[in-house]
């Protein structure tokens, strides 16, 4: 059975995260993996996914500049869920980057720094997959406002799955507390969005939740999530196993 992506997009908008994930695992098998930076949304999604597929593949971009709290959380996730997080590293070491681009590239050209340390490793990883899963929400940034739960990733040329696209921050935190999901303690210290040590600061009262990322630059994204503003792109080669779309059922969250 073959189904255009645009049809799946429309139907999946009414699906709960569990339904979206069941569809993803049934459709792509080992050719789908979850990307996470271990933000609170990512933690909720790891918990949901692990209940459905204990062997879910999870990877993260390790820029060599993450906070100690983030590294500690990765260890806690591996122990709690019994999964091994794949860490994606840049082919360029921090020392090599400094030699080629000068010291503190993130202060002068954060886009270039993100490209070297995050985007290129992700691009290499996604080249071997048919689909990837993210925890982005539409209300996070303008670039994510048009995200669909299932869409074609124009930038990386594969299916992109966003089960939490229509969730709000309160919904995420409600799930975290209800299921006692571990999270980065920096969230309790006014860090709603956490990236690298050099480009993340605490958010001041009244600021946007991502104001602490790349402060001083007109930048809210690292470059991983291109805005699919017209995501109605047919995926003619997507094979959906017969009955999968119709048989998915949601667990209570």
Task: Name each region found by the language model.
Residues 1-253:
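Nucleotide-activated chemistry modules centered on ATP-dependent adenylation/adenylyltransferase
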């Amino acid at each position: 059975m073959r189904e255009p992506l645009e049809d799946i997009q429309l139907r999946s908008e009414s699906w709960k995260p569990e339904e979206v994930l069941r569809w993803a695992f049934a459709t792509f098998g080992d050719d789908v993996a979850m990307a996470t930076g271990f933000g609170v949304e990512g933690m909720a999604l790891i918990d949901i996914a692990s209940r459905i597929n204990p062997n879910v593949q999870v990877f993260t971009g390790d820029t060599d500049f993450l906070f100690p709290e983030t590294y500690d959380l990765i260890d806690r996730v591996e122990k709690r869920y019994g999964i091994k997080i794949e860490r994606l590293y840049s082919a360029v070491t921090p020392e090599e980057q400094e030699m080629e681009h000068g010291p503190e590239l993130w202060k002068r050209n954060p886009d270039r720094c993100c490209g070297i340390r995050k985007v290129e490793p992700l691009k290499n990883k996604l080249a071997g997959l048919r689909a990837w899963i993210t925890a982005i929400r539409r209300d996070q940034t303008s670039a994510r406002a048009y995200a669909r739960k299932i869409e074609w990733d124009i930038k990386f040329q594969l299916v992109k799955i966003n089960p939490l696209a229509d969730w709000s921050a309160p919904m995420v935190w409600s799930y975290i507390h209800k299921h006692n999901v571990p999270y980065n303690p920096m969230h309790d210290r006014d860090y709603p969005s956490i990236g690298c040590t050099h480009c993340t600061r605490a958010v001041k009262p009244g600021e946007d939740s991502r104001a602490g990322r790349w402060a001083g630059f007109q930048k809210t994204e690292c470059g991983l999530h291109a805005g699919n503003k017209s995501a109605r792109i047919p995926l003619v080669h997507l094979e959906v196993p017969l009955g999968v779309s119709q048989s998915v059922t949601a667990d209570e969250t």
